[in-house]
A protein has these predicted regions:
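Autoinhibitory propeptides
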Residues: 2-75, 80-84, 258
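Solvent-exposed loop/turn segments at secondary-structure junctions
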Residues: 15-17, 24-27, 46-48, 100-104, ...
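Subtilisin-like serine protease catalytic core
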Residues: 82-120, 125-175, 189-192, 205, ...
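Gly/Ser-rich catalytic serine loop of serine hydrolases
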Residues: 126-137, 217-218, 307-319
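Short acidic, glycine-rich surface-loop motifs adjacent to enzyme active sites
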Residues: 160, 165, 184-216, 239
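Hydrolase catalytic cores
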Residues: 163-167, 250, 294-329
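Active-site-adjacent substrate-recognition loops and nearby beta-strands
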Residues: 176-179, 203-211, 238-260, 264-287, ...
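Catalytic-core regions built around general acid/base machinery
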Residues: 216-233
């Protein structure tokens, strides 16, 4: 394929695909004629990439009487504090966070003792993953924070891989290719659990939008790859989505995958958050599988101070960290 003159971006062994880029569409016609190529599909149209500007730091988070800081309620609702009291805090477990960027994780004082094994950017390998979106940073904080009386996450002694697959400036199928490459990479480095607070159903090209009947665990590439990761022994934890109050309402791939854990959101009283996406899958499986705090979740902000945020993006890592501690036990 490279000999045709295209640039290979990522490959996927589990689903047997290659993602390429080129400026000459006739090269795709040449690739389509190769005897080992089953089909081709356009998954992305190039746009000018914009660079994130680093947010300024304050690095003065408020200390509290509680060991967990303000995160005590979201920890206690999942009972992870009981696991911690028993000595199970995620030590020896490896978690991959597949997300958007991890803004300022390398600069925030309260995050400097997180055990990060490595980073990989599948969207733009030359980019600084710590200067991209803040979404993955806040997701990571729900699990990995380990600052007594500031914030303790649900798996503070686990080790983490930070993997970027989401391009915040567009919604294209290529992001699922990046995600597939990321989860296969996670498998290759021995990851135990994957948290992904991502999901897709609507794209820049409306012809690519998913329909409810597509939520069968097999239609979307991400869902197939997530199921294969589970088959290989990884625990895949995924946000249900935030469309519960909108017209779509349903979970989003890869949340429809078989044998993964899809997490909805509740408030700190245990009441379902109105935005939390619902099931079932198109083939009748109950989703989401579990819920955790996702309304007014306590997370780290890009300035190094704590903030509150809404979304199943945060209930998912809260649950993922608890599962890591339970597995350790």
């Amino acid at each position: 394929i490279r000999k045709t003159g295209v640039h290979v971006l990522v490959t996927g062994k589990w689903d047997n695909f290659v993602t390429v880029s080129c400026n000459d569409s006739t090269l795709i016609d040449e690739i389509a004629k190769l005897p080992f190529v089953h089909s081709t599909e356009r998954v992305w149209k190039g746009i000018t990439q914009r660079a994130f500007q680093r947010d300024s730091l304050i690095n003065k988070p408020v200390r509290t009487d509680s060991l967990y800081g303000p995160a005590i309620t979201q920890a206690a609702m999942s009972r992870v504090d009981l696991l911690h009291d028993a000595g199970f805090k995620g030590q020896g477990m490896t978690i991959a966070v597949i997300d958007a960027g991890f803004h300022n994780v390398d600069k925030i004082d309260a995050m400097k003792n997180i055990h990060i094994l490595g980073v990989r950017d599948f969207v733009n390998p030359e980019a600084d993953i710590y200067a991209e979106s803040s979404h993955g940073m806040s997701v990571l904080s729900c699990m990995a924070m380990n600052q007594p009386h500031v914030m303790i996450g649900t798996a503070p002694e686990a080790s983490y891989w930070l993997l970027r697959s989401e391009d915040e400036y567009s919604e294209n199928l290529v992001e699922q290719d990046y995600w597939a490459a990321a989860i296969e990479f996670a498998d290759s480095v021995g990851v135990d659990l994957v948290n992904t607070s991502l999901g897709y159903y609507s794209f820049d090209d409306p012809a690519k939008n998913y329909r409810y009947r597509d939520l069968n665990g097999h239609y979307a590439l991400m869902s197939r790859e997530a199921a294969k990761a589970a088959d290989k022994g990884m625990v895949v934890v995924c946000s249900a989505g935030n469309s519960g109050a909108g017209s779509w309402k349903k979970i989003t791939p890869p949340g429809d995958a078989e044998n993964i854990i899809t997490v909805g959101a509740v408030n700190k009283r245990g009441e379902l958050a109105p935005f939390s996406s619902v099931g079932n899958t198109a083939d009748g499986r109950v989703k989401p599988d579990v819920v955790a705090v996702g309304l007014n979740s306590d997370v780290m902000g890009t300035d190094g101070n704590l903030r509150r945020a809404n979304g199943t993006s945060f209930s998912s890592p809260i649950m993922c960290g608890m599962i890591a501690c339970l597995w350790q036990a």
